[in-house]
């Protein structure tokens, strides 16, 4: 007697059952745990004699493959303690700042709209400055790990498709780089005049939506020694309009001498109505904080959409104060 195989049995034998994909996790009501600190491995400067690179190629796939010397540091959560920090002592400050702008991805809309003016007025109010000149801004909206994976087969000098959070300890301008930037962005006569009184470069960093992953940490300027700062050439193969010059000098930062030397801080769950002011340079040499190393970092509690943020770089001038 010949057995009969039904159509259903044949299909079941030929095509293994595959469960449908799980729906994405609904994180709309999820909250970050209130942890007082994270112990995180940070990427510090690797000495070129030990295999480190002499040049930082900004905006490239190669930057994401750069070799570093890593150190585990403690990053304290200052949510609720924001008022304890200020620009002149620590080099950074958290402020409340509402904006009328809701869309940050359109470069020209930000440049031509009200946002730069709002930032300038806020900086004058917070710092007492007499003049603020906005250099430009940078919008970040890509996840670091996802971008690293997507670009894994691309050559080092390939420009990334967008901006991810920066995951290495640095200061955007060295002392030399700040002066160079001043003369690049302002008319020579005006730059010479403004250099005679106190001036600074301050970045205004703000989330575009609530931060649930890859937060930004800042290091107390007093805890970083001058001999841990290395003037490093920063090159960009293709200039981003107003975001960075093609050639820049920045500080790469050496690892701390002891695990607790560098004092790192962040504020959890920053929202669109909060901003972090980060000092990159100050002409004052009287003990005023002059530069702040910073870096983003992953946490085991990260969730949600990629972190989206905008960083506005500004010259800040006090024409009624001595330069140093």
UniProtKB/Swiss-Prot annotation:
Residues 1-33, 288-308 are annotated as: Disordered. GO terms for molecular function: oxidoreductase activity. The keyword Metal-binding does not apply. Residues 1-11 have a biased composition (Polar residues). It comes from the Eukaryota. Pathway: Mycotoxin biosynthesis. Its EC number is 1.-.-.-. Keywords: Oxidoreductase. Disruption phenotype: Abolishes the production of cercosporin but accumulates a red, cercosporin-like metabolite called precercosporin. Belongs to the asaB hydroxylase/desaturase family. Hydroxylase/desaturase; part of the gene cluster that mediates the biosynthesis of cercosporin, a light-activated, non-host-selective toxin. The perylenequinone chromophore of cercosporin absorbs light energy to attain an electronically-activated triplet state and produces active oxygen species such as the hydroxyl radical, superoxide, hydrogen peroxide or singlet oxygen upon reaction with oxygen molecules. These reactive oxygen species cause damage to various cellular components including lipids, proteins and nucleic acids. This is Hydroxylase/desaturase CTB9. The gene is CTB9.
């Amino acid at each position: 007697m010949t057995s009969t195989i039904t159509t259903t049995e044949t299909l079941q034998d030929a095509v293994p059952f595959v469960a449908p994909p799980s729906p994405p996790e609904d994180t709309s009501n999820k909250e970050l745990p209130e942890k007082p600190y994270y112990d995180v491995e940070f990427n510090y400067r690797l000495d070129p004699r030990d295999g480190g690179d002499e040049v930082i190629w900004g905006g490239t796939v190669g930057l994401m493959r750069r070799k570093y010397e890593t150190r585990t540091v403690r990053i304290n959560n200052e949510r609720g303690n924001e008022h304890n920090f200020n620009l002149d002592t620590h080099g950074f400050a958290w402020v409340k700042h509402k904006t009328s702008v809701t869309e940050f991805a359109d470069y020209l809309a930000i440049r031509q709209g009200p946002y730069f003016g709002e930032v300038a007025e806020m900086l004058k109010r917070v710092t007492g400055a007499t003049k603020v000149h906005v250099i430009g801004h940078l919008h970040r909206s890509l996840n670091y790990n996802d971008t690293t994976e997507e670009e894994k087969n691309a050559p080092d000098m390939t420009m990334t498709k967008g901006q991810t959070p920066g995951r290495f300890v640095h200061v955007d301008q060295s002392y030399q780089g700040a002066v160079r930037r001043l003369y690049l962005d302002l008319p020579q006569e005006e730059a010479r005049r403004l250099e005679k009184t106190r001036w600074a470069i301050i970045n205004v960093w703000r989330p575009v939506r609530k931060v649930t992953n890859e937060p930004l940490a800042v290091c107390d300027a007093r805890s970083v020694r001058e001999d841990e700062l290395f003037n490093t050439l920063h090159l960009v193969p293709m200039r981003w309009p107003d975001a960075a010059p093609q050639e820049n000098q920045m500080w790469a930062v050496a690892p701390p001498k002891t695990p607790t030397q560098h004092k790192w801080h962040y504020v959890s769950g920053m929202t669109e109505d909060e901003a972090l002011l980060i000092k990159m340079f100050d002409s004052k040499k009287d003990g005023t904080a002059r530069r702040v190393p910073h870096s983003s970092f992953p946490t085991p509690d990260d969730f949600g959409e990629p972190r989206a943020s905008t960083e506005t770089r500004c010259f800040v001038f006090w024409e009624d104060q001595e330069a140093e």
